[in-house]
UniProtKB/Swiss-Prot annotation:
GO terms for molecular function: rRNA binding; structural constituent of ribosome. It comes from Psychrobacter arcticus (strain DSM 17307 / VKM B-2377 / 273-4). Belongs to the universal ribosomal protein uL24 family. Keywords: Ribonucleoprotein, Ribosomal protein, RNA-binding, rRNA-binding. This is Large ribosomal subunit protein uL24. The gene is rplX. GO terms for biological process: translation.
Amino acid sequence: MSKLRKGDTVIVIAGKDKGKQGTVQAVKNDRIKVEGINIVTKHQKPNQATGVEGGILKQEAFLHISNVAILNAQTQKADRITYQFGEDGKKQRVYRSNGEVVATA
């Protein structure tokens, strides 16, 4: 289970896009898709049955979740997440560095 969720702001810590920030668009198993990160060129073949036009498309590709870290909004640095139980007894995601609750999108 991933500690990152759709809508989180993350920073890339390894790879060709190291240092860039973006918002999580999708999470699948141990891979993550981030807005504006890991742009690849896809050659799309036209298909009359579905009405898809052919051409060369630029789109985001999935990257491994170990190559990103959540961005702490207060410190503007990469951080890790842990879980704690709040006063109401619900499990909350918390930044490890300062103990603040992670804002959910």
